[in-house]
Swiss-Prot record:
Iron-sulfur cluster binds at residues 45, 109, 111. This is Iron-sulfur cluster insertion protein ErpA. It comes from Hahella chejuensis (strain KCTC 2396). Homodimer. InterPro entries: FeS_biogenesis, FeS_cluster_insertion, FeS_cluster_insertion_CS, FeS_cluster_insertion_RrpA, HesB-like_dom_sf. One of its GO terms (molecular function) is 2 iron, 2 sulfur cluster binding. Binds 1 iron-sulfur cluster per subunit. The lineage of its organism: Bacteria, Pseudomonadati, Pseudomonadota, Gammaproteobacteria, Oceanospirillales. The gene is erpA. Required for insertion of 4Fe-4S clusters for at least IspG.
């Protein structure tokens, strides 16, 4: 008798640095209803690109990752490309930015904002 295995995808990782930056930006805005929305769109030099925005709305099919009282929200279409990815915030010589380490991306462009699968 075969037993079916249930596959649970690795969730999106929301790092401490990213959560702290989101918290700081939300405090600056003075609106506790805001969440960081991460999404994938077509475009960029590699075929897909990441996008970030602040959003008050949370849709029924959104995935929510909460950390330290702030939320990261991903729509269901983008989630399939971001399963197992890490959302981080980095400050360096090239500036300060949210970055995504995506194990699903087979190639990325030099700036890291677009990818292909």
């Amino acid at each position: 008798m075969n037993v079916a295995e249930t596959y649970e995808p690795t969730p999106i990782i929301f790092t401490d640095n990213a959560a702290a930056k989101v918290k700081s930006l939300i405090e600056d805005e003075g609106n506790d209803e805001l969440s960081l929305r991460v999404f994938v769109t077509g475009g960029g030099c590699s075929g897909f690109q990441y996008g970030f925005s602040f959003d008050e709305a949370v849709n029924e099919d959104d995935t929510i990752v909460e950390k330290d009282g702030v939320r990261l929200v991903v729509d269901s279409l983008s989630y399939q490309y971001l399963v197992g990815a890490e959302v981080d915030f980095r400050e360096g010589l090239e500036g300060a930015q949210f970055v995504i380490k995506n194990p699903n991306a087979s190639t990325t462009c030099g700036c890291g904002s677009s990818f292909s699968i």
